[in-house]
Amino acid sequence: MKKGTRKVVRITTLVLITALIGVTLYFNLSSDTQIVEAGDDYIDFELETLDGDIVKVSDLLENQGVILNFWGTWCKPCQEEMPDINELYNEFDREVEVVAVNVRESNQQINQFLNSLPEEMDFTIALDRERDVTRAYNVGPMPTTIAINQDGTVVKKQESQLSREDIVAFIESAQE
């Protein structure tokens, strides 16, 4: 290759790499997605439920605190903690609202998962098909559970399976 051709190839490669870095930075830094952590105000959302209704956090917060539990059908810890969440939800006379947010799975997968559990779940199953809510609440591993008190403050977040003691702590935090 001639010296002049090599120089053109190097400059073109450098320009392309710089452009790719610029585009990547632009899309990552210009995102208007808010990420919520403990201590922040909640981000409101509307999601369709497995029953075909719409659930909206702000409507639920009018009467009580809310616990969001993000889960997937493939998640063994999710399967293990759900019956405990349901049992304690009922033991506490539903003093907080529990919304189990499934991430990107079909109704068939969800129903098959729920049917494999030892009992029927009494709380709301919401469907985050586009992962908008999952991203807004900065959910990484599943299960992830978030407690929001009635004032609309995220008071607790855990990115792992909840023990029965953890579930009680989440319910009590959401009641503050």
Which residues fall in each region the model found?
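N-terminal targeting signals for export/organelle localization
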Residues: 1-46, 176
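A generic structural signal for alpha->beta connector loops
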Residues: 44, 64, 95, 122-123
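A short beta-strand-turn-helix
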Residues: 44-66
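Conserved beta-strand termini and adjacent loop/short-helix elements that scaffold enzyme active sites
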Residues: 50, 57, 101, 126-128
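Short pre-active-site segment immediately N-terminal to redox-active cysteine/selenocysteine motifs
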Residues: 64-66, 71-74, 141
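Hydrophobic beta-strand anchors of alpha/beta hydrolase catalytic cores
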Residues: 67-68, 98, 145
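Structural microenvironment flanking redox-active thiols in thiol-disulfide oxidoreductases
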Residues: 79-117, 129-136
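Thiol/disulfide oxidoreductase modules built on the thioredoxin-like
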Residues: 115-121, 128-175
